[in-house]
Design a protein with these regions (language model features):
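Donor nucleotide-sugar binding/catalytic pocket of nucleotide-sugar-dependent glycosyltransferases
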Residues: 1-28
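A short, well-ordered alpha-helix in the C-terminal region of glycosyltransferases
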Residues: 35, 174, 181, 188-203, ...
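A conserved mid-protein helix/loop that constitutes part of the nucleotide-sugar donor-binding site
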Residues: 44-67, 165, 173
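Short, structured helix-loop element that forms part of the nucleotide-activated donor/catalytic region
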Residues: 67, 76-103, 188
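Aromatic "clamp/platform" in nucleotide-sugar-dependent glycosyltransferases that forms part
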Residues: 109, 128
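A short hydrophobic beta-strand element within the catalytic core of glycosyltransferases
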Residues: 123-124, 139, 146
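Short hydrophobic beta-strand element within catalytic cores of glycosyltransferases
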Residues: 145-148, 158
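Conserved acidic donor-binding segment of nucleotide-sugar-dependent glycosyltransferases
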Residues: 160-161, 165-172, 181-186
């Protein structure tokens, strides 16, 4: 990704009690934004941001949410994006589950995704193929660890147990195990959250990436 991420814009520092704008939802602190979303402070919240289609791994993620529900686990999924009916739509029944289940908080497409990262604990990004996924960079910059598939791009940003977890694409059981691990290891997730931002600021900051790209071009010229 030639652009990297703007770590000043994607920063949790913009979301504090002091930044709450009266009458404007999704501003302020994690607690305030969760309240806007009808999520409680105690909820463990996974987030997905992107096109809600099959090749983003959404059928597998839905299967995991159904399994949590069956086991009586009150795990929340914050879903940000659009359902697509033409290109690679979800399996029958999965869209309905995601739209109607009380453990799924569906907010549709959002031009500013930062408040939703603030409300979440872990990004789930079970995509089958990516270039260099902006959403994983953005999550990291916001201090959110990620569960990603072992594919190009994702596995360059996420290092196992440092700033997230990695599992094989299209493997719903493996995804479920990683999600369960996150829920059972909340203290580790807090450490990973801090490390997540550090990794992005260190390696994928916009200026850093531009500088590296420029140096590559200079080498080619010589």
């Amino acid at each position: 990704n030639i652009n990297g991420v703007d770590v000043d814009y994607f920063s949790p520092s913009h979301f504090t009690t002091e930044t709450r704008i009266k009458g404007k939802p999704y501003t302020g602190s994690k607690q305030q934004i969760r309240k806007d979303l009808n999520l409680s402070d105690d909820d463990f919240v996974f987030i997905f941001i992107g096109r809600i289609v099959g090749d983003k791994g959404m059928n597998e993620l839905t299967a995991c949410m159904k399994k949590f529900k069956k086991e009586g686990k009150d795990i929340k999924l914050l879903l940000v994006g659009r359902f697509e009916s033409e290109l690679d739509p979800l399996d029958a029944g999965n869209e309905e589950f995601l739209r109607t289940n009380e453990n799924v908080c569906f907010v549709g497409y959002q031009s500013d995704v930062r408040p939703f990262f603030v409300a979440a604990d872990v990004l789930v990004f079970p995509s089958y193929r990516e270039g260099f996924p902006n959403v994983v960079l953005q999550a990291g910059a916001m201090g959110i660890p990620s569960i990603v598939t072992d594919i190009n791009g994702c596995n360059e940003i996420i290092k196992e147990d440092l700033n997230g977890k990695i599992f094989p694409p299209k493997d719903a059981d493996a995804l479920f195990r990683e999600m369960e691990w996150c829920i059972d290891n909340k203290d580790r997730i807090k450490v990973m959250a801090l490390q997540s931002r550090e990794v992005i600021v260190d390696k994928f900051r916009q200026e850093e990436v531009w500088e590296a790209t420029l140096n590559e071009y200079r080498k080619l010229e010589n």
